[in-house]
Amino acid sequence: FRAVSGDIPDVSVLGNTLDEIARLGIEADQAILDAGFYSEKNIKLLCERNINFITRLPKSRTLFKTLTDQIGDIETRKYACMYGERALFIKEETISVCDTLMYAYIVLDPDKKAKDTRLLLKEALEKPDHDADVDLQIKKGGLFILISKTQIPLQEVLPAYYTRQNIEQVFGFAKSNNNLLPLRVHSRDAINGYLLLVFMTLSLFIMLRQKLQPKLTMDAALISLRNLKAKIYDKEIIPQELNKKSKTIFDQLEIMVPKMLGV
């Protein structure tokens, strides 16, 4: 991991991050990047280092407008894909970025488009003097574009990109489920030590969660296990009897509860 100050833009940290990874003896061959990292300089850097990547194209880019102007018949059966319970349309286009052949995946989410259109029309009708180009915004509603250095089967495009989101959700557990709020620290060693503890805690949390799902959530399991008590003596700890629910949870977690623990 790498700790970066919040006032440093994402687009400027990629080069140093790759350099640090290389100095650790790790060969980076894949990258999943949010739109904040997109720039011609970063794309060129990834290509020079032969790193395959997938990134979201910012809507402010000219390339975004060019591609959305060419979507044509995207809302047809042949471009339909399922991602979980979401039905979407995904269309592949071959493009050139930094003189390199790449693949653009234009994704249209019908539900998001309907929501965006409703909000835009509501605002336009309530504020007729509003200067925003409503027609253009409606045209872009529900659309986003992913750029990849390698060709990806349409059914695998969103799972590949949303791996990043899954990682972000994992760190969300550190703030919500685990109450691992950042400490007030004043040195890089302290924040790196804190992040190491977060990684260790999250690793344990995820391992336990995987064993419990889909029958039980971690929140429900931890609430149930609060009822587990123990008596503490001078030289030993004796856990009290488990109820049926606690036994089931420990069985799923493959954890054996000892009859006695030394102090």
Task: Enumerate the predicted regions with their spans.
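Anion-binding and metal-coordination hotspots
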Residues: 1-263
